[in-house]
Amino acid sequence: MCFNLPLPHLPPYLPFITSSFFFFSFFPFSLTNTDAPIEFETTIIDPAEQTSHHVSESRPTHLSFSSSSESPRDQSREQSSRDVSASPVFPKRQQSLLRLDEHMAGGAGESRDEPHGEPSDDAHKSRASSTSSSSSFGQSWNQSSASQRASVSSMGGVDVAQKRPGPSSGGLTGASAASGMPPAPTSQAPAIPPITPQMQTGAFEQYTPQTAPPIPTQSQLGQDGRKRAATLDRQQQYVPSYGYSSPANGERGGPTGGTPGGTPMSPGGVAHVTSPGGGPSAASVHRSFSTTTPHAPTKNSRRIVSTSAAPMRKQIDDANAALGRAVDPSRDSQPMQSRDKRSKSISSRGGMKGVFSNLVSSMGTLSRKNTTVRRSESDTSAPSTPKISGPYDAKHVTHVGFNFDTGEFTGLPKPWQKLLSESGISKVEAEQHPQAVMDIMAFYTDQKDDGVWQKFGGANQAGSGATATTPYNAQNGFSPIASPGATTPTLGALNLGTPLSVDLDTEGDTSTSTGGGGGVGGGDYFAKPRSAPFPPAAGGGSASSSTATLGTGATASGGATTATPAIPSRDRTRESSLSSGTSNQGPPVTPLALSQSRQNLREEAPATPEEKPLAHFVASRKAPRPPSASPKKTGGAGASGDSGAGAAPPSAAPKSPPPRPPPAPPLGVPSVHAPNSEYRQKMITQLEAFNAKRQQERAERHAQKQKLAAAHAQAVQRQQRQQQQQQQQQQQQQSAQQGAMPSVMPQMQHGSMQQAQQSVSGGSSGLTPQQKQLIQQKQLLELQKATGGQVGGPVTSSTQQVLSNPAAAAAASQRKREQRLRKDQQVVARLNQICTPGDPTKLYRNLVKIGQGASGGVFTAYEVGSNLSVAIKQMNLEHQPKKELIINEILVMKDSKHKNIVNFIDSYLHGGDLWVVMEYMEGGSLTDVVTYNMMTESQIGAVCRETLLGLQHLHSKGVIHRDIKSDNVLLSMRGEIKLTDFGFCAQINESNLKRTTMVGTPYWMAPEVVSRKEYGSKVDIWSLGIMSIEMIEGEPPYLNESPLRALYLIATNGTPQLKEPDALSTIFKAFLAWALQVSADQRASASELLKHEFLLTADDVSTLAPLVKAARMAKIQEKNEKAQR
């Protein structure tokens, strides 16, 4: 009889599955599903009556038992057992079925599982071989276990509900406890055994198990949970296991729960009990259900093969020996099998089940795929959102702020971000002090817009390095001599090393000075002797200068001199000057790799006729240096490839002959010099070939350009002739119609064409500059269109707009020009009121140029009559970007007559130039003294005292200098100290006691100036403190940083730290601490500092005279060495 299994969780194609059930019902197979009841078929026989009964029962696959009291279901099961026992099938009450839960029925035997399916062929063979031995073992078992049967009978039958072992049983229940057999382990869950023919020859007793516990999740199944879950979908997690006792006649045997020898052992370790008559009167069925955690499926998951203890194996062997059967050595490893006929049906049943399972799983997968496809189709079928175009020609104006919640800037422009990253200000530093960063960036933006980064900025600096020097004269002492005239390196349009200004106040509070040294000393008063470093940018600008700043390596490339980003400390220069006396050598010039490669080729290769073109080529292209084992002599090389600084000139020593070739190496040893010569020859050949190819390409391009120019000229001439002919025809027609009176329009057209022709031929003298520029732009546009962009580049939209609407562009430029002219006229009118009328050339003689600025030069002269040496600043007003600042400086100098301030003598307007005559300070600036000398604390105190006296005078008149630094402190040869450069001065009055303009040089700026707070005269005291550090260490703090980062450090760090504070006295450190207070309210004033103990012990200014002379001699020596190189 066969059975059908309902599957409640199958997909919607259940009708197909149901029809398949009826089709497969002809085949004996079993199929289970998770949480689905399974229908068992059992045949019960009575050996005494030789009758059999078929009983079917439906049971859930997930089973469990209660461990304590009997549930109502257990009571119903017991009642069903009594009913069956009362039937003719059970004539004797003593034959009772023992049921145990597998939780407590585990014994010492091992268990092996098979996959969910039918046993293999080996299992069938093992089961068939154990059928006959099981019956004989039953007889020996009945004869040798009377006491055990009595013990079991005394128990009155052990019900399955009594599952938990008590303390008296020692963990064994039922017959297992009576026989002394150890319990089976409980860690493995037995699987469902196959329905074999032995099931048709045994006693049956109705049983209804309890509800199973919850199914464990995949995470509880162990590391291979996914594999287990895939198998458990087809296998029951809580499965029953069966043990059967064989009939007495041995015709139908094969217990499935015992050993291969036929031991009636259930997986739970309970022996089957026979009748006390000595033979089995009835076969009893034992079923045990496992509630343990499901185990991993193995090859034999449908049956449990339990291995009994050693005594039980001995009994099995004795029983087989009594029957005359040999002991199967593989009985422990081979599973038991039923008869061959039944095993075939079982095997076929398992195969059909596998096919059906695969069919169901594949159809389930197909259903899921169809659901996914339908869902995706529904998603894609939805109407797409219409795309809305963004705004065009939009301008986004944002306010730069800081979000304290996220710690980031809001609305920060990209140029600001780039400048911050290039200046070395990290994101963390910017987030820590956002307000300081915003103030600094706003200041830099204003400086770039105003273009006032240097005091004479905006003019062409070509030839700014021309200086006239006068050697030392024994009679007259030191003649006027220029200080190192190195212009400041620029970063784009910004000159970062010179004083800065942002004019946000009144007209008089503008921040551009008229010169680097308002009171002219022995130096370049426009070009500062020390420049600030480049920010660490990839594409920094270069400075055109004839003289490099001291301590800065210079590299000559194409006739230009560029300053390196890092400015070394001046300590090395001062130490070298002290150690070597006055013969101070300049720093070595950075050698060019180009000249190195050429010099190496000349030294290694003999002179050849091809050397001249090769040298010409190498001078403009860098060649790789050949490898060499011996070190090469390197040094600075100029354009002519000479050796570095300190080496003798080429004419001093004759050129040595080429070295002899090295001796040949022994046989078998490769020469290390051969690759050099081969490489050198190869390089020479390649360079010659490349040079020839390059010259050929240049010649071809030149010829092509000439052809294009000739074709364009011919086209223009042809077009002009055609236009002339047309105009002549029109004029003739009009003259014929109107008689002798020609029309005005043809004359205008003819005149315009004549002007165009004259402009082409060079006779455009009658046109205005605007008309000439417009005609040139039109011609360039035509040439670009004719050549396709090869000449003049591609046509841009801006050029077309200008040409299409030249009137608007001309009107805008005209308005700007008129505004500038009106402003200049106002400045000139104001200067005429201030300046003295007359010709300065008749009042001063022997003008000697000692410096060159952006908008003028600095001269020394002698006053006619008094023979007084004076300094004259000559400025071209047309090239001066901030003309109103000149007025500010002249007015401040006129009103400030003091022994510590460079005195103003007179001013003149002559030939469009402004002449400012001032006192001449031949000692130069304090920068020279600091650079070439080491100063003592007493000498530093003298400088501070004299500077404070000058500041006290300015502050008493309501004037703030705002640019105190060593460059603006001049000395005489006697050591006298005076302040200069009053271009940044600001007037403080009762209505305007505080200023907010950010002006000055970054490294000397006070924190309140950097942060753009209100400030007063105490900003000069902070700058004095920084200048004191400059005299101690040779340079101001943060000089090796970019100006932008220096401003950030000033705003965030406050008082700078000294490099060696222990080397200073306590009084000096107290003086610096008072002058460098971050809070302006706690900072001392000029009058208070003059009373400090440090200044009371300072030396006289006469002690500075030797330092001035030493600095002058060191500068002369340096200039001579540079001239020789």
From Swiss-Prot:
Specify which residues bind ATP according to the UniProt entry for this protein.
I850, G851, Q852, G853, A854, S855, G856, G857, V858, K873
The catalytic site is made up of D963
Give the enzyme's EC designation. 2.7.11.1
Polar residues bias: start-end ranges? 197-210, 233-248, 287-309, 358-370, 576-599, 795-804
What positions does the domain CRIB occupy? 388-401
Principal cellular location given in the protein's record: cytoplasm
Isomerase as a keyword of this entry, yes or no, is: no
Name of this chain's protein:
Serine/threonine-protein kinase STE20
What species does this protein belong to? Yarrowia lipolytica (strain CLIB 122 / E 150)
